[in-house]
């Protein structure tokens, strides 16, 4: 008799090979007369050095990671702080705060506006309920403890950054405006959400006294076999009279950080991914190492660095507690004081 798990394991390994957000972007040719990152049927990275890992390298990585996730998942409990959300539900409008919920999910409170980045309260970064990277630690803030959410920024469509159940819960409970890169508005509409504004790189929108600018990132997009790079990926800049905030989402290191710093900086705070960087033959063009994150922080001309995208989902080969140690070491090597290179506990809130 064939047990169900003997079928599920190879199927899950295949599914994970498709959905784990750790492969390289799909290269396509630019369209004449269009922005350089626009391509036939979708979008492309413009860095001439960008190189996609070969098919065998990707295949072996995905199968190995998928099998390990199912048969020998790693465990890690990130440091956390109790946060019942009471202070967040009665904020001081003159004291901007930021709270790390986990991975790339941040609650930003500025000028009376409550904004979330890449909200994810799900148990897995996967389309499957029984397979895929499982959350290692509970969210730092319970969904029910959120203050009223006015705006939501989405960087791209990968399952660790765009969780369908979470955004549907947000739409039902808070009715926020979602700001998304090109191509994602239709995905939201297909899932019953219409308060969505989509932007191309360097386009901006004004909402509730804030200017939000969609800025380039070096990454890729994909949620299935059939939609590789049909939707754009991006970072975001939030500009208010008293503060400037940069949210990196997912990106490999490239000249776009310096360009964003020159065009929109200096920033008061830059939240940049520091995890999912090994193996380098897979990750090097689409995820920053902790050292590259510190360089990006300097390129952005930011006052504060916040390392995110670590310790929540097991997406790379590096030790799960390594990214913060490497980021702090690199900041120290460059003479950046510890109070400018932030690593948060889950649920931690700081003024910025």
Language-model features: where?
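Catalytic core of the metallo-beta-lactamase
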Residues: 105-111, 206-268, 284, 288-292
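Active-site metal-binding motif and surrounding structural segment of the metallo-beta-lactamase
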Residues: 51, 58, 130-179, 195, ...
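Acidic/histidine-rich helix-loop elements
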Residues: 121-138, 220-227, 278-287, 314
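Metallo-beta-lactamase
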Residues: 11, 18-145, 181-249, 268-275, 326-348, ...
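Divalent metal-coordination and catalytic microenvironments
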Residues: 108, 118, 156, 163, ...
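Cap/insert and terminal regions of metallo-dependent hydrolase folds
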Residues: 24-50, 142, 151, 158, ...
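Bacterial N-terminal signal peptides that target proteins for export
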Residues: 2-11
């Amino acid at each position: 008799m064939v047990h169900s798990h003997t079928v599920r394991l190879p199927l899950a390994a295949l599914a994970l090979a498709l959905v784990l957000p750790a492969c390289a972007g799909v290269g396509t040719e630019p369209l004449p007369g269009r922005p350089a990152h626009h391509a036939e049927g979708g979008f492309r990275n413009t860095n001439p050095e960008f190189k996609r890992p070969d098919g065998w390298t990707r295949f072996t990585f995905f199968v190995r990671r998928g099998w390990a996730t199912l048969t020998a998942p790693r465990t890690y409990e990130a440091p956390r702080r109790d946060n019942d959300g009471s202070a967040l539900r009665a904020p001081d409008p003159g004291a901007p705060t930021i709270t790390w919920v986990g991975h790339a999910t941040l609650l930003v409170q500025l000028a009376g506006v409550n904004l979330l980045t890449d909200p994810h309260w799900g148990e897995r970064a996967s389309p499957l309920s029984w397979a895929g990277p499982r959350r290692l630690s509970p969210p730092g803030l319970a969904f029910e403890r959120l203050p009223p959410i006015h705006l939501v920024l989405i960087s791209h469509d990968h399952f660790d950054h765009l969780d369908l159940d979470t955004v549907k819960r947000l739409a039902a409970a808070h009715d926020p405006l979602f700001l998304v890169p090109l191509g994602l508005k239709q995905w939201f509409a297909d899932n019953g959400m219409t308060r969505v504004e989509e932007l191309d790189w360097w386009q901006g929108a004004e909402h509730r006294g804030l200017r939000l600018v969609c800025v380039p990132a070096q990454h890729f997009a994909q949620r299935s076999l059939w939609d590789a790079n049909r939707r754009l990926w991006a970072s975001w800049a939030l500009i208010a009279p008293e503060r400037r905030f940069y949210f990196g989402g997912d990106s490999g290191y490239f000249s776009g950080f310096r360009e964003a710093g020159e065009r929109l900086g200096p920033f008061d705070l830059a939240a940049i991914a520091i995890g999912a960087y090994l193996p380098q033959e897979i990750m090097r063009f689409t995820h920053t190492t902790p050292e590259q994150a510190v360089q990006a922080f300097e390129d952005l001309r930011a006052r504060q660095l916040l390392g995110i995208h670590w310790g929540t989902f097991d997406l790379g080969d590096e030790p799960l507690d390594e990214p913060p140690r490497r980021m702090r070491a690199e900041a120290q090597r460059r003479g950046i004081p510890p109070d400018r290179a932030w690593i948060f506990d889950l649920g931690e809130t700081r003024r910025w």
